[in-house]
Amino acid sequence: MRTPEPGDEIDGFRLGERLHTGTMAWIYRLLGPDGPLPLVMKIPRLGPGEPAINVISFEQCRMVLGALAQGPHYPTLVAYGDIETTPYLVMEYVEGRRLSEWMREAPRAPEEVAALGAKLALALHEIHRQDVIHLDLKSANVLYRPGGEATLVDFGLAHHGHFPDLLAEEVRTPVGNWEYMSPEQILGIRCDPRSDLFALGALLYELATGRLPFGRPSTAAQLRRRLYLDPAPPRALRAAVPDWLQEVVLRCLEIDNRSRYASAAEVAFDLANPAQVPRTERASRSTRAGWLQRFGRRMSAGSFAPAPCPPLASQAAAAPIVLVALAFGPTIDSVGGGQSDEALCEALRRSVRRLCGADGRCRIACATVVPPAAALTGEGDAATATGRHIRQLVELRRWARPLELAEERLTYHVLESEKPVAALIDYASVNEVDQIFVAGNLAAEVASRAPCSVTVVRARPQE
């Protein structure tokens, strides 16, 4: 896929100035007959050299933004192009000043830190109230509108409590901005809104002191220090930081999520009412934890276990998760087992349709396994990681389309592994799958190793 240029037209939208070039996507201002429109288009970066996570992030962002009620704390999704044809998101253009502009002139006055932080906390509270966790909070992803409201952008790594988390289900490494990432995110936990409060604390720390609380980790080993190493108290770096602000910041940055604030609304209240902030020993802390305490934390870091994720704001009844194992084209192992792939696909579809008719709550996870990206050979977009990923997603969607299920009940996963059975079993274990539907050569081994019920499907003789 070539890089879009200003002046290009996509589905009737004309691209204007490129506003942002990120690692996963480009953002363009859109043009109308009389000049710039109050809209932007986000286009995922696909093609040679681009990782498959770009596709996953695009799908995640589309689902989350589409589910949020219209409001000032996030951009409104206007239109989108399907991943099968031309993927893009058309969103409201947010006028405002980025938090990164204030950050460039840090340290800031405590009153300014509190005002900016309180508005940001209210924005977080609003998305948390709708069961969304941002999980990629950084100064570049926060804007302040002319009216003063904080607006969160870039929901490509976000989690929605009522939608499948494609990143949690397919990615095994920490994703997000390492400078602000919470300890539980490092361990792959993406369902806790208190992770956003940790990132908020890191931003407040940087605004108040001009320094990052944990520096800029460049290796996984450096990142894991966050499981046991607390930051230097802000007042030790800048005496002008008041004790109430240090109390708020360090409470947000607690390693144990149970020791943080319970909600972003509480953070907003404390920042707006400094005189009412209850001071603990955090407020007067002048040094990091002593070497003995740090040593003990480090020794127990290997077994560090955050508290379970809190219930959703609007807790829904648990719905069973059903994994359907499919294979299309050049996957690692054939599902055929002597029968045609088309016949087996239809048999699987028929079995899933019966299940959905019996249980209207179940979620269907359609998955296929492909070789790792390093095993790709050949030229052109089809031989790239993103090209192959999209091709397999298209096949999965085509298989599922006749089921006529609501979008929130279907997910599509392209798993990379040289061992297809192990990949399917790992997916089922990590995502607490309740039942697996499988056909062909993989069926016996999957059935013997699966952590859940397995239905082995065969095509009818006439098929």
Each language-model region and where it sits:
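Activation segment signature within eukaryotic-like protein kinase domains
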Residues: 116-117
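Structural helix C-cap motif within protein kinase domains
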Residues: 209-213
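Protein kinase catalytic-loop region centered on the HRD/HxD motif
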Residues: 122-132
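AlphaC helix of the eukaryotic protein kinase fold
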Residues: 48-67
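Conserved short submotifs of the Hanks-type protein kinase catalytic core
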Residues: 84-98
